[in-house]
């Protein structure tokens, strides 16, 4: 039971938003993933659920995602999901049978999961999960038996307690997807979360994205950051946590992780956009990076 009791005092904030309010950022991400399915060929991520989940009424928003300025965000949302799912597939091949999606939002993996033995835990705020249930029902998308929802009461339970109560086997490794969450956290919440994951058995891993400190960015990157920062702050979900790659690795190693992969824009383009006839690729003016850490 040490996995539960150590470091329990810090509640986990999956997103910085008002209690009882579904995430507007989660909707924007879902619209961009859906737009990728409708617009880009070949697709970076095959997601037949994305368009039907958000339902009708967002056609104009999907059209905006075609604009040059919005294109990079559209592509990045699909790349980061593909990256995490590629790392998940690697862990499944090594025997991992538990997948925890932290801040799941409108993520669709659980409804197109190709791994019969993989159990999926979706963790998010109660309001966001209720909204997702409504969208799934409206779209006629059944919830598979191997999917468990964890509506985390941030004021009363730790992540570890909630996962154990939901049936996570802490004696076995797990893979964690943590996309679009870290930049919204406090440092204390980030450390508490990676400490919880870091106490799981060897073979456990987590994939996530993070943002660079604004003061370290070039003028062009700072302009991109400022635009994004103002937009999410206006939605009530301000960016507040940043790392240099070196500082991030120190945090992860201190939490018990033995290996860290840093996956920058150049890696993303070489891996997911190589030899495309349409010339699509991510702009080099990105303000963050993808990462995976293994216990």
Predicted regions and their residues:
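Rossmann-like AdoMet
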Residues: 2-4, 11-100, 104-150, 170
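Rossmann-like AdoMet/SAM-dependent catalytic core
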Residues: 24, 219-295
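Conserved SAM/SAH-binding loop
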Residues: 153-156
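A short, conserved alpha-helix within the catalytic core of class I
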Residues: 158-160, 184-197
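Short amphipathic alpha-helix with an adjacent loop that forms part of the alpha/beta core around
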Residues: 159-170
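A short SAM/SAH-binding and catalytic strip from SAM-dependent methyltransferases
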Residues: 173-188
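Conserved beta-strand signature within the Rossmann-like core of class I S-adenosyl-L-methionine
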Residues: 200-214
């Amino acid at each position: 039971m040490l996995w539960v009791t150590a470091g329990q005092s810090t509640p986990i904030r999956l997103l910085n938003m008002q209690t009882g309010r579904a995430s507007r950022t989660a909707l924007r991400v879902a619209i961009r993933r859906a737009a990728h399915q409708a617009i880009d060929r070949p697709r970076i991520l095959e997601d037949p659920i994305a368009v039907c989940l958000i339902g009708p009424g967002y056609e104009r928003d999907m059209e905006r995602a075609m604009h040059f300025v919005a294109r990079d965000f559209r592509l990045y949302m699909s790349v980061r999901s593909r990256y995490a799912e590629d790392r998940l597939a690697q862990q499944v091949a090594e025997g991992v049978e538990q997948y925890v999606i932290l801040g799941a939002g409108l993520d669709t993996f659980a409804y197109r999961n190709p791994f019969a033995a993989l159990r999926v835990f979706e963790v998010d705020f109660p309001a966001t999960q209720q909204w997702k249930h409504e969208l799934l029902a409206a779209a006629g998308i059944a919830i598979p038996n191997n999917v468990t929802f964890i509506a985390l009461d941030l004021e009363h339970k730790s992540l570890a307690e909630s996962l154990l109560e939901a049936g996570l086997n802490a004696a076995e490794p797990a893979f964690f997807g943590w996309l679009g969450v870290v930049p919204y956290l406090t440092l204390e919440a980030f450390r508490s979360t990676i400490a919880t994951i870091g106490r799981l058995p060897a073979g456990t891993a987590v994939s996530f994205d993070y943002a660079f400190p604004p003061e370290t960015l070039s003028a062009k990157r700072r302009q991109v950051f400022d635009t994004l920062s103002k937009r999410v702050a206006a939605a009530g979900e301000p960016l507040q946590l940043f790392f240099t790659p070196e500082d991030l690795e120190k945090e992860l190693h201190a939490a018990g992780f033995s290996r860290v992969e840093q996956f920058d824009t150049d890696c993303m383009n070489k891996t997911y956009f190589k030899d495309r006839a349409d010339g699509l690729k991510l702009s080099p003016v990105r303000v963050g990076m993808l990462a995976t850490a293994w216990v």
